[in-house]
A protein has these predicted regions:
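Aromatic- and glycine-rich beta-strand/loop motifs that create alpha-glucan
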Residues: 1-25, 80, 242-244
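Short helix-capping/hinge motifs at transmembrane helix termini and TM-loop junctions
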Residues: 33-41, 118-126, 153-157, 180-185, ...
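Transmembrane helix segments
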Residues: 32-37, 155-195
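Transmembrane helix boundary and interhelical loop/hinge segments in multi-pass membrane proteins
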Residues: 66-88
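Long, hydrophobic alpha-helical segments
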Residues: 32-33, 51-71
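Alpha-helical transmembrane segments of multi-pass membrane transporters/translocases
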Residues: 33-34, 203-245
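Short hydrophobic, aromatic-rich alpha-helical segments embedded in or entering the lipid bilayer
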Residues: 2-4, 180-219
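Alpha-helical transmembrane segments and their short interhelical loops
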Residues: 92, 100-163, 215-219, 223, ...
């Protein structure tokens, strides 16, 4: 396991441009739009900056779950690294845990960097326990992005996989209210938004950060989406392996 983690650490440094882009682009959007949008009510402005910082943190994390995770899994398949692992003394569970640990590390860096930018450059304020709690809830919500990434990794064609990942990455945050409040959408779009997984990630984290309230409904939605996506990915993988055998 230690050797696998070392390999993942080396691979992370080799792909540093992707790592920087995954964090830098959402942070750039946060700084840009937070400087443009201004409300006459100071409290409303504070709420906007807080919620926008949190949604952009989730947006940053989604890039690692939807792109980095499935691409590293597919790369290991095409380069036969996974085949080597399966025929070695290393357990397949240790292999997947090392991959998950790498993405979780990316998640944590994205959370820390975006939170620091919000605090030092936009004067976002929260009690300490809410900073920690919001980060923990975002990290927990990262399981959703990992599950979707695992499902995307089952797509054989790299071009189609990239297309699907980009659609989910760009469309879901827009529909879910990460960019603009869903109250600005038509009613029929709002009804769709409230069923999307990213909407419930935003609800879970933002409600806790603002009021210290825990949304069990949103947590259940996130867990349900995570279980369904993971189950579907494992089913497709097992079917493919049985057909091959």
């Amino acid at each position: 396991m230690k050797a696998l983690l070392k390999i993942e650490w080396i691979k992370t440094w080799r792909s540093w441009p992707v790592f920087i882009m995954g964090i830098g682009m959402p942070v750039g959007f946060f700084l840009l739009f937070s400087s443009i949008v201004s409300t006459p009510n100071p409290e409303a402005q504070k709420d906007f900056l807080l919620s926008y910082m949190l949604t952009m943190t989730g947006f940053s994390m989604s890039s690692f779950g939807l792109f980095t995770f499935p691409y590293m899994l597919q790369e290991d398949q095409t380069e036969h690294w996974l085949t080597y692992i399966e025929h070695s003394k290393v357990s397949i569970a240790a292999y997947y845990l090392s991959k998950i640990f790498r993405v979780l590390l990316n998640f944590m860096v994205a959370i820390i960097v975006t939170f620091c930018v919000g605090a030092f450059f936009r004067d976002v304020e929260m009690p300490f326990f809410r900073w920690v709690g919001s980060g923990a809830l975002l990290l927990l919500s990262g399981l959703l992005f990992l599950a979707f990434g695992l499902l995307i990794a089952q797509i054989k064609s790299q071009q189609f996989m990239s297309l699907v990942a980009n659609i989910i990455y760009l469309v879901l945050p827009i529909v879910s209210g990460s960019w603009v409040p869903i109250s600005m959408f038509p009613k029929w779009v709002q009804s769709i938004s409230e069923w999307t997984p990213v909407y419930h990630v935003n609800e879970l984290v933002v409600n806790f950060a603002k009021d210290g309230k825990f949304s069990w409904k949103s947590l259940l939605f996130i867990l349900a989406y995570t279980v369904v996506a993971t189950g579907l990915a494992l089913f497709i993988k097992s079917q493919r392996e049985s057909d091959r055998g």
